[in-house]
């Protein structure tokens, strides 16, 4: 039976090879930032609808979507085992799809179609497949927003693929927490009475340095990064420039 499933999956994807490649190229050539993925949303939902999925556009978020194909329920129940394939499609500022979200979208759509074809061919197989469009992965935490809005409440298994240097299966992931920290001080004239002030910039620099020094005690799977709040790129990327502005007064 496993060989038959594999053959069905391979055939479904091979038949659509060119269309799937065109999907990836379209996203590559039309990069859109987090929560602005209008072209990607429209292309992907039209594509999945043409493949027989029931599509909810603008699902819980303006550029999210849910494309579903439902097979039969478990015998004697109304429960339908549900697999969600997560589809990412937002790009990065300045460098477009350097993180490969065009490929993630292609893989997710291909996987969703392959599962749908298996459910169609093997009608006794219970199950439902959902291709869930999850915008804003690079910034704004799109999946977290969807979780909070209940997008995963009827999902039993969620999976996705990410391009990398090697092929492998990863079943555990690191959680992420994004913080914005602001330091507040008290202003004073730096030339005539600096002792009357409290420099919030000093506090920010010391905090950054202490966190950086802490890295030598962090385990290899732990990551901490930061950026200036004026930097354009997300904090997960190292800063390529670090502007400082100051003044020197000497006799």
Stretch-by-stretch model annotation:
Residues 2-129:
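Acidic/His- and Gly-rich active-site-bordering loop/insert found
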Residues 65-66, 73, 90-98, 102-103, ...:
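Histidine/acidic-residue-rich, glycine-tolerant segments that coordinate divalent metal ions
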């Amino acid at each position: 039976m496993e060989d038959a499933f594999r053959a069905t999956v391979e055939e479904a994807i091979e038949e659509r090879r060119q269309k799937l490649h065109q999907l990836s190229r379209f996203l590559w050539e039309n990069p859109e930032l987090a929560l602005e993925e209008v072209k990607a949303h429209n292309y992907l939902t039209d594509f999945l609808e043409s493949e027989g999925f029931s599509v909810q556009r603008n699902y819980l978020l303006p550029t999210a979507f849910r494309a579903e194909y439902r097979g039969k329920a478990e015998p004697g129940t109304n429960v339908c085992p549900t697999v969600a394939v997560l589809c990412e499609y937002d790009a990065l500022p300045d460098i477009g799809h350097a993180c490969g979200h065009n490929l993630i979208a292609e893989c997710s759509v291909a996987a969703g179609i392959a599962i749908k074809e298996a459910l169609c061919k093997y009608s006794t197989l219970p199950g439902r497949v959902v291709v869930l469009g999850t915008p804003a992965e690079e910034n704004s935490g799109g999946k977290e927003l969807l979780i909070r809005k209940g997008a995963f409440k009827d999902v039993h298994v969620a999976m996705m693929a990410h391009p990398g240097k090697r092929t492998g299966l990863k079943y555990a992931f690191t959680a992420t927490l994004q913080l914005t920290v602001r330091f507040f001080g008290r202003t004073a004239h730096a030339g005539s009475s600096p002792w009357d002030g409290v420099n919030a910039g000093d506090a920010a620099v010391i905090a950054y340095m202490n966190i950086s020094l802490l890295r030598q005690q962090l385990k290899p799977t732990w990551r901490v990064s930061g950026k200036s709040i004026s930097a354009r790129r997300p904090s997960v990327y190292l800063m390529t420039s670090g502007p400082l502005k100051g003044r020197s007064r000497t006799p």
